[in-house]
Amino acid sequence: MACLKLQAVTKSYDGKTQIIQPIDLDVADGEFVVMVGPSGCGKSTLLRMVAGLERTTSGDIYIDNQRVTDLEPKDRGIAMVFQNYALYPHMNVFDNMAYSLKIRGFGKTQIRERVEEAARILELMPLLQRKPRELSGGQRQRVAMGRAIVREPAVFLFDEPLSNLDAKLRVQMRLELQQLHQRLKTTSLYVTHDQVEAMTLAQRVIVMNKGIAEQIGAPSDIYRRPASLFVASFIGSPAMNLWAGRISDDGCRFDIGEDIALVLPEPKPQWRGKALTLGVRPEHIQLATRETGGIPLQISTLELLGADNLAHGKWGGQNVIARLSYEHCPAIGSTLWLHLPTSSWHLFDSQSGLRME
């Protein structure tokens, strides 16, 4: 096992536009870190630079306190698991897992010991003589992980390994990955566009946006205290409600359009007249009544999800989603009265997108 360190790493293809803005990252020995973000945010490019498949434009990469920035991938002590499995179709499972050890000159006994140990961990022992075409998608992905495990790397790199699996199998493989990490405790850097994978697998999450690490932190911290509008809108399903408005001239209210005025938890005279965006997660919106000061919402759509329901409407022309318990099924066109507890507010500067404290 080893630590992984990125020091002011950047990437530019034309010398003008930085695809990856300077990023610093310390992944502790045995830590599982997930990079998440939309397509084109730079997460896979950053992973490929750690692997040595892409050159850094500037900055340095260290694995186990050794500078590896200019080393070839084979010399970095890493093993990579890809989205498309990358198995040799003419080889059986054993030979696919053993191949990298054979070309590195390992003896037959050591190869068999390593392959069989990985196969036992991944429950592949009965499948060692099968060809990839005889395996399910989940079994193929386990073989790909087994091929990485036998290398006994300092760092595991995962590039969207579950993207090709169906929804049910993804859930199963997420659990298997968690159990695998708990057993091996190998330092891991994992890339995904799926926030559920990020939140369930990671000890720390890096939220990427346009080549910038918008926020790095524990999944619970990122969910509860998003550092920017982007993080607030990207993490969470359904997404956080975000309402543009402004602080009143006396610094005591947040006004959404002309009809909704929310009293701030405490006066903010320094924010007078400032354009802000208020965020509240759908599950934090509470049912209220007209008499208790609730805000009316006319229901335009209702999504019945089984365990709960999502009520949709608009305030001042801006979308509202409220998560209701399954027994609340308001009719389309009816009015709900809602309360936004100030303890669940997230305020952001509408111009910079940064969190306001």
Swiss-Prot record:
Gene name of the encoded protein: ugpC
Main localization category: membrane
Organism whose genome encodes this protein: Pectobacterium atrosepticum (strain SCRI 1043 / ATCC BAA-672) (Erwinia carotovora subsp. atroseptica)
Positions of ATP binding: 37-44
GO CC annotation: ATP-binding cassette (ABC) transporter complex, substrate-binding subunit-containing
Residue span, ABC transporter domain: 4-235
Similarity comment text for this entry: Belongs to the ABC transporter superfamily. sn-glycerol-3-phosphate importer (TC 3.A.1.1.3) family.
Job description of the protein: Part of the ABC transporter complex UgpBAEC involved in sn-glycerol-3-phosphate (G3P) import. Responsible for energy coupling to the transport system.
Keywords in alphabetical order: ATP-binding, Cell inner membrane, Cell membrane, Membrane, Nucleotide-binding, Sugar transport, Translocase, Transport
InterPro entries, sorted: AAA+_ATPase, ABC_transporter-like_ATP-bd, ABC_transporter-like_CS, ABC_transpr_MalK-like, ABC_transpr_MalK/UgpC-like, Mo/tungstate-bd_C_term_dom, NA-bd_OB-fold, OB_MalK-like
Gene3D superfamilies the record matches: 2.40.50.100, Nucleic acid-binding proteins, P-loop containing nucleotide triphosphate hydrolases
EC number: 7.6.2.10
GO molecular function, one term: ATP hydrolysis activity
Name this polypeptide is given: sn-glycerol-3-phosphate import ATP-binding protein UgpC
Membrane protein topology class: Peripheral membrane protein
Stored SUPFAM superfamilies: MOP-like, P-loop containing nucleoside triphosphate hydrolases
Any coiled-coil regions, as ranges: none
Pfam families the UniProt entry points to: ABC_tran, OB_MalK
